A protein has these predicted regions:
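A structural signal for well-ordered alpha-helices, especially hydrophobic packing surfaces
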Residues: 6, 13, 32, 39, ...
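Conserved alpha-helical segments that form or flank metal/cofactor-binding pockets of metalloenzymes
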Residues: 22-59
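Short alpha-helix boundary/capping motifs
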Residues: 30, 56, 63-74, 126-130
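Helix-loop segments that flank and shape redox-cofactor active sites
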Residues: 5-31, 93, 97-108
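Acidic/histidine-rich alpha-helical segments that form the ligand environment
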Residues: 40, 44, 61-114
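Long, contiguous binding/interaction regions
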Residues: 16, 21, 33, 53-61, ...
Length: 132
């Protein structure tokens, strides 16, 4: 999902329109940079525990449960609403990963994803505050 989210954040960064363009354009760049760091850290953790990360878009798209966006302009309001929906998904997905890691006795992975969970929860709060 993070690989698809990374591309989706670029899409929003390029196609967002409206009065909040400058604010959202900058925030979306920050988010896709953070997402790239997360993708790298997760891939390295997977390799460290003997697993294989997804490293091609065909497989990423086949496995992803979040949806891509069309290459067309999107309003500031729709951008934030879509981000809220995606971040809520990231939170659910991350909680599930923490539970699975805990059940497997992998505290390192659980800790890593708990850190992401805190960041996603903070981002969700900020996005919801933005649209009030």
């Amino acid at each position: 999902n993070q690989e698809v989210a990374y591309i989706k954040l670029h899409n929003l960064h390029w196609y967002v329109k409206g009065r909040s363009f400058f604010t959202l354009h900058a925030k979306l760049e920050e988010l896709y940079d953070q997402t790239a760091e997360i993708i790298d850290a997760v891939a390295e953790r997977l390799l460290a525990v003997g697993q294989a990360p997804v490293a091609n878009m065909k497989e990423a798209l086949a496995l992803a449960t979040i949806k891509e966006l069309a290459d067309k302009p999107i309003s500031s309001e729709e951008t934030v609403q879509g981000l809220i929906a995606d971040v809520e998904y990231w939170i659910r997905d991350t909680k599930e990963i923490v539970e699975l890691a805990d059940a497997a006795g992998d505290g390192v992975t659980a800790d890593q994803f708990n850190d992401y969970l805190g960041e996603y929860q903070k981002l969700l709060w900020m996005l919801k505050s933005y649209i009030v």
